């Protein structure tokens, strides 16, 4: 029987979402899996320009945009292009945004397990495999596509267990509660000393393209500041940070 792991409540998300943003003319948000990357980009921009940029983190991108829909200070969203396309009512067209780069789907495994590739998930000693919820996390969508295209969905069956976010999947693998899990490169690199290993999956799913897009109701007084931050994201100054977090241009 599949294990359905509880997602964080939207109410808890809301309490985090609008904290500490009152003075900022740019307020950026992202899903749980890329909080550290976005925070690093914001910190670098603040240091280089002395400009104010606020952040609004908490929950998956769907939960966050549900709060944006109800009104709030967020005016720039960073996530994968496929997820952002679902929010055409809240966000401007993707063409108005900035492509940050591509990031691969990763399979990571716990200590005590050895995999030579993702096809080894079908090995007898792999009893439990975790993946993020495909309705809430892009890497869940990518994992679903990969499992289907490779035929592993039928082979693994009920060995696949669902969590709500990439960080949750990673924590289960680190603790050994799951033998393997589908995550992103940020999570895998950040926990490389706590797991058995990881490998990038190159084919079998739609590419994950990280993108920054303004909200549709961007206020006129905030436009110049948001565009300046987006210009930084598109510049070479952001590239080393993106590469560090597994986003490749």
Regions found by a protein language model. Name each.
Residues 1-7:
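Bacterial Sec-dependent N-terminal signal peptides
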Residues 8-18:
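Bacterial N-terminal signal peptides
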Residues 18-24:
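Sec/Tat signal peptide C-region and signal peptidase I cleavage site
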Residues 25-50, 54-90, 95-249:
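Exported/periplasmic ABC-transporter solute-binding proteins
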């Amino acid at each position: 029987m599949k294990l359905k792991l509880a997602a964080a409540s939207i109410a808890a998300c809301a309490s985090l979402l609008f904290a500490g943003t009152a003075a900022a003319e740019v307020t950026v948000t992202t899903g749980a899996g890329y909080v550290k990357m976005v925070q690093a980009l914001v910190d670098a921009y603040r240091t280089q320009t002395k400009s104010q940029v606020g952040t609004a983190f908490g929950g998956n991108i769907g939960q966050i945009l549900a709060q944006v829909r109800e009104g709030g200070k967020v005016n720039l969203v960073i996530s994968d292009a496929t997820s952002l396309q679902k929010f055409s009512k809240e966000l401007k067209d993707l063409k108005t945004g900035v492509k940050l780069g591509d990031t691969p789907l990763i399979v990571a495994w716990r200590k005590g397990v050895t995999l030579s590739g993702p096809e080894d998930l079908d090995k007898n000693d792999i009893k439990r495999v975790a993946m993020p919820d495909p309705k809430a996390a892009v890497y869940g969508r990518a994992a679903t596509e990969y499992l289907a295209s490779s035929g592993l969905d039928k082979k693994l069956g009920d060995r696949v267990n669902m969590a709500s976010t990439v960080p949750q999947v990673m924590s289960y693998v680190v603790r050994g509660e799951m033998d393997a899990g589908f995550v992103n490169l940020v999570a895998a690199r950040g926990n490389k000393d706590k797991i058995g290993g990881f490998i990038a999956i190159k084919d079998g799913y739609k590419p994950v393209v990280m993108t920054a897009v303004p909200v549709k109701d961007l206020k006129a007084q905030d436009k110049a500041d948001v565009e300046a931050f987006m210009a930084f994201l598109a510049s070479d100054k952001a590239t080393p940070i993106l590469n560090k977090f597994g986003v490749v241009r």
